[in-house]
Amino acid sequence: MKKFICIMPTSVLESHVYEAVGNKQLFNKDTTRFPLTPLLTGYTESNEEIQVIAITATGDARSEFNVSLLEREIVNKNRSGKVTMIAVDFSAADGSLELLTKLIPLLEDGDHLYVCLHFASTTVQFAIISALQYAYRALRNVSIECVCTQGESGKYQNVDITALVQAGELLQTLTERHHKDPAKILRMTLALGEEEDEGEE
């Protein structure tokens, strides 16, 4: 199943047009409160069933209200499926570990994973990426399709960092196999990816 993971902020959200950086599928000319929306519209078809995993702050009414707004947005974009809410106490020292323990059980064999890291602290981003890496390695037929985050301060952008996450996975594998020149393999992989991109244009 296609699963979309995002963080619900504790603030009032304004609508913006999010510029796609590094991935044409994130292009979306419409204004939206949620930077997740371009992932939904770029990677799914109308009436396609999906699951959204929305991470909220424990006991925060605004964060939970933003989930209800997201549910409406999904319906307005003609997508179907459920929104699963994970409440996490981010004020606690082990909040990111709590997130990991709640997120990992929701990832299953055959999942195609899409992640919007907007509104996430550095530790929360690390926890989510760790969960992705677990799913990719421990489960069957899991793919990390798109990971995006915010761009420069003051700009409304969706910056695709999927290649960086995948490179981290590749380096981990090469390390386990005691490869003598992991940088060379990484360069070759990046060059191959660039050739494929040119072929698509």
Predicted segments with their positions:
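Long, low-complexity, Lys/Arg-enriched
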Residues: M1-H112, A127, Q133-E201
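Polyanion-engaging groove/track-forming segments
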Residues: T122
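Short glycine-rich or small-residue beta-strand-to-loop segments that form or flank ligand, phosphate
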Residues: L113-F119
